[in-house]
């Protein structure tokens, strides 16, 4: 009776047209249901049957239905899938040739049917790691999700899976680039000054092979210091647009992961031909600058294409122990090295004081280093504080990069610059209001200037804690890479252009070529904005890879502590609606403390990212940068999540 009824069809069409629709992101839960978040303001419940049509992270359009004053979302159209290419673990049942894959993501737990592409002949076993690409989606008219396996990564028993899986996830190279060593010859027709008689020294870790900077310093009759910064010159071997140049441009950076690195350049170049090894003549680009009594740089800055010869390979810890009066077997091997170390220390102290007064100095935080055995097991995690020798090299490199920025700006007006513009103007009123609430009166317009930003930073550095600094840090812009000079608010400098790590950074290779063009008075080609985009994307991928491997290793290391009485001091680094994130001071691991662990009565606790505090019964119980004792409650190896509980 009702079949093909035009009135009924019209009614359905009207009801469909009248049903409100929203676009948003699907947020999954581990309980089968989900939510559709719209513009971060409103969320709609997605019942379990409807969640089978979508995946956490999908951007969709959904119909909103109201039943007994309760709203729910019915997914209708896929705008952008969350999963396209992904890594995961294969599932295969014994005696069954069918394959499934579970994506390696904390909120994606459903197995997706899959099959290998024709060219992939690896016989997959249960729990193998693989790369897959989504091929079917229910909102695209398919009956179910389906994926295609495109790469085998490694098997379930490989203890180095954290590295291989992470590199494949971020589509990063696994090995050093390989080129015919016979092609690694000098292509350098630029006249070089012979500076091999100067007593350059390198300062690195004991295990460092790719030594790309050497320092020489002397005191002039007028009391000023003359600092020479020699930087390895791979551009003497790498012609623009050559095969090797293309490789370096693609990789953009050496990738430093816990336990090992994947170099940007062939190791024959980075660890041998270009490495500033002691007593070996090497091509270098050298910057010479004077440092006055108050630590200011002189206006006279000279760049040379030169030959240098390091006279000694010095080690950070040895120099620091000796200069800091620690018990050590090491001492300068001769008077020349002794003089260099003492003058470099003087330079470092003067430059540090000058930067504190006229620019900005970063708050020092320790670096955390994983100690691994040959099988990739974490034996220990050590905190390495920045010591005297580290500060010597840091001040010399910052000085060199300031000089490069000045020379490039004066002579060309372009280069590769690190630019940081401070606070986002959209949030500057919130910054001013937050500061006012804590007794600091400011002018919003002044905070957007380099001088005003520096003045505020120095005032914040004098605060008894970093709470206020952490509150307003989220209103800052991210640092960028630009082809034209601009200020670096974070360093408190008018311009900053790095060139001191050309073995490890392609941006520094580009600046080397521009500096050489200035030296030779030849034409210089302005870098493309696309170069900056590619370098920034690769830097982000490398940092994410380092974080992901670190999370995996932290989870392995802390798993034995879960549920024990072992106590760790932890710094509160973020506060969200669901709880707080902390960093373990001893080893740098990030853990999450759910709000119910802070206070059991839900209506009596408020976790506020806006105020950077946790309010319990109307009183501030925790705030950003507090140090609190915690125990490890649970470690989920599958998701690399560490859950802690305050004591």
UniProtKB/Swiss-Prot annotation:
The lineage of its organism: Bacteria, Pseudomonadati, Pseudomonadota, Gammaproteobacteria, Enterobacterales. One of its GO terms (cellular component) is cytosol. It is found in: Cytoplasm. Belongs to the RNR ribonuclease family. RNase II subfamily. This is Exoribonuclease 2. InterPro entries: CSD, NA-bd_OB-fold, RNase_B_OB_dom, RNase_II, RNase_II/R, RNase_II/R_CS, RNase_II/RNase_R, RNR_Ribonuclease. Its EC number is 3.1.13.1. GO terms for biological process: mRNA catabolic process. Keywords: Cytoplasm, Exonuclease, Hydrolase, Nuclease, RNA-binding. One of its GO terms (molecular function) is RNA binding. It catalyses: Exonucleolytic cleavage in the 3'- to 5'-direction to yield nucleoside 5'-phosphates. Involved in mRNA degradation. Hydrolyzes single-stranded polyribonucleotides processively in the 3' to 5' direction. The keyword Cytoplasm applies. Residues 565-647 form the S1 motif domain. Residues 192-520 form the RNB domain.
């Amino acid at each position: 009776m009702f079949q093909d009824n035009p009135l009924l069809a019209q009614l359905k069409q009207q009801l469909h047209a009248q049903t409100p629709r929203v676009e948003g992101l699907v947020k999954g839960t581990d309980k089968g249901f989900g939510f559709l978040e719209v513009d971060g303001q409103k969320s709609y419940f997605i019942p379990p049957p409807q969640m089978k049509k979508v995946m956490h992270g999908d951007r969709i359009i959904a119909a909103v239905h109201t039943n007994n004053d309760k709203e729910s979302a019915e997914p209708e159209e896929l705008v952008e899938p969350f999963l396209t290419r992904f890594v995961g673990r294969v599932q295969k049942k014994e005696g069954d040739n069918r394959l499934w894959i579970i994506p390696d993501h904390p909120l994606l737990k459903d197995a997706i049917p899959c099959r290998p592409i024709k060219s992939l002949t690896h016989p997959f076993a249960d729990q193998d790691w693989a790369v897959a690409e989504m091929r079917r989606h229910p909102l695209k008219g398919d009956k179910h999700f389906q994926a295609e396996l495109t790469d085998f990564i490694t098997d379930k028993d490989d203890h180095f899976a954290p590295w291989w899986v992470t590199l494949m996830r971020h589509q990063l190279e696994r090995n050093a680039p390989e080129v015919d060593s016979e092609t690694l010859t000098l292509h350098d027709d630029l006249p070089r000054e012979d500076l091999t008689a100067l007593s350059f020294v390198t300062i690195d870790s004991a295990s460092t092979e790719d030594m790309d900077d050497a320092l020489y310093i002397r005191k002039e009759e007028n009391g000023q210091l003359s600092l020479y910064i020699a930087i390895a010159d791979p551009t003497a071997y790498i012609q623009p647009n050559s095969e090797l140049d293309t490789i370096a441009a693609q990789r953009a950076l050496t990738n430093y992961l816990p336990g090992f690195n994947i170099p940007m350049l062939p190791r024959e170049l980075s660890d041998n031909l270009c490495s500033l090894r002691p007593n070996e003549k090497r091509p270098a680009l050298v910057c010479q600058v004077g440092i006055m009594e108050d630590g200011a740089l002189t206006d006279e800055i000279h760049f040379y294409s030169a030959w240098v010869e390091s006279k000694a390979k010095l080690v950070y810890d040895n120099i620091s122990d000796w200069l800091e009066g620690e018990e050590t077997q090491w001492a300068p091997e001769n008077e020349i090295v002794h003089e260099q170390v003492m003058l470099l220390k003087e330079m470092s102290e003067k430059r540090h004081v000058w930067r504190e007064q006229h620019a900005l100095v970063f708050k020092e935080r320790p670096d955390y280093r994983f100690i691994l055995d040959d099988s990739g097991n974490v034996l220990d995690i050590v905190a390495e504080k920045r010591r005297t020798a580290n500060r010597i090299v840091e001040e010399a490199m910052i000085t060199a990069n300031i000089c490069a920025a000045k020379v490039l700006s004066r002579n060309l007006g372009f280069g590769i610059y690190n630019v940081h513009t401070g606070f986002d103007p959209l949030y500057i009123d919130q910054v001013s209001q937050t500061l006012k609430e804590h007794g600091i009166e400011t002018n919003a317009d002044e905070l957007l200037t380099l001088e005003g930003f520096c003045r505020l930073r120095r005032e914040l550095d004098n605060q008894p804690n970093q709470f206020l600094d952490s509150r307003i840090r989220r209103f800052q812009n991210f640092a960028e890479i630009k082809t034209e000079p601009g200020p670096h608010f974070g360093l408190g400098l008018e311009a900053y252009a790095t060139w001191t790590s050309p073995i490890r950074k392609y941006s520094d290779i580009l600046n080397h070529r521009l500096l050489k063009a200035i030296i030779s008075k030849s034409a210089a080609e302005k870098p493309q904005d696309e170069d900056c985009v590619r370098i920034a994307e690769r830097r982000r991928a490398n940092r994410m890879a380092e974080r992901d491997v670190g999370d995996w290793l932290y989870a392995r290391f802390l798993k034995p502590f879960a549920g024990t009485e072992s106590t760790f001091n932890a710094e509160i680094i973020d506060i969200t609606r669901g709880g707080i994130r902390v960093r373990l001071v001893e080893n740098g691991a990030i853990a999450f403390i759910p709000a119910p662990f802070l206070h059991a009565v839900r209506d009596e606790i408020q976790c506020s990212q806006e105020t950077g505090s946790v309010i319990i019964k109307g009183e501030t119980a925790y705030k950003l940068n507090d140090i609190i004792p915690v125990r490890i409650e649970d470690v989920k190896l599958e998701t690399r999540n560490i859950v802690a509980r305050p004591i």
